[in-house]
Amino acid sequence: MSRLIKKPIPVPNGVQVEIKENIIKVKGPKGELSQEYLPYVKIEQKEDGIWVTPNEEMVRRQSDRRKLAMFSGTYWALVRNMIIGVTQGYQKELEIKGVGYRAQLQGKKLVLNLGYAHPVEIEPPEGITIEVPNPTSIIVKGIDKYLVGQVAANIRRWREPIVYSGKGIRYKGEYVRTKVGKKV
């Protein structure tokens, strides 16, 4: 059984949680998130926080208990991430390494010069803000942890770090292992 589900998820002041049928909605100072959940879990709000437990009605045979525990741990983490997102928010920082590689904002659109014949334009989805404090760093911010990570990964995918020179877009603090090139 998942160890996470043995304790409740604390709900800070200023956060409202609404649970209806198979949807949980979390409202906070930074915004609102909702998540649909499967009938394998029961999500209940009590005085000490939100409890995510396996739905014992879904057990048909003994092997189902392990599956229910897996779903319970997953939804526990998803609900906790929603609460953190609406209170603190999430951000991912990216660094650009390479001669002539740079980023700039045009309105909300991110424009990257990465050595291609044309600049790469990226329109952030709703709920995501992109900041460019200097031409070689990008900050992706939002309240949805999954969406922030996905947008950062999509930006990084345009020019992943090259293993021989280390040039490209990388996460801040990411270690890129470089190889030695051919010797002539």
Swiss-Prot record:
Transmembrane domains' residue ranges: none
Signal peptide residues on this chain, from the entry's feature table: none
SUPFAM superfamilies: Ribosomal protein L6 (SSF56053)
InterPro entries reported for this sequence: Ribosomal_uL6-like, Ribosomal_uL6-like_a/b-dom_sf, Ribosomal_uL6_a/b-dom, Ribosomal_uL6_bac-type
Gene Ontology terms: cellular component: cytosolic large ribosomal subunit
A Pfam match: Ribosomal_L6
One of the record's GO molecular function terms: rRNA binding
Gene Ontology BP, a term: cytoplasmic translation
Keywords, sorted A to Z: Ribonucleoprotein, Ribosomal protein, RNA-binding, rRNA-binding
Protein's UniProt keywords contain Ribonucleoprotein: yes
Protein task: This protein binds to the 23S rRNA, and is important in its secondary structure. It is located near the subunit interface in the base of the L7/L12 stalk, and near the tRNA binding site of the peptidyltransferase center.
Quaternary organization: Part of the 50S ribosomal subunit.
Family of the protein in this entry: Belongs to the universal ribosomal protein uL6 family.
Name of the molecule in the record: Large ribosomal subunit protein uL6
Upper classification of the organism: Bacteria, Thermotogati, Thermotogota, Thermotogae, Kosmotogales
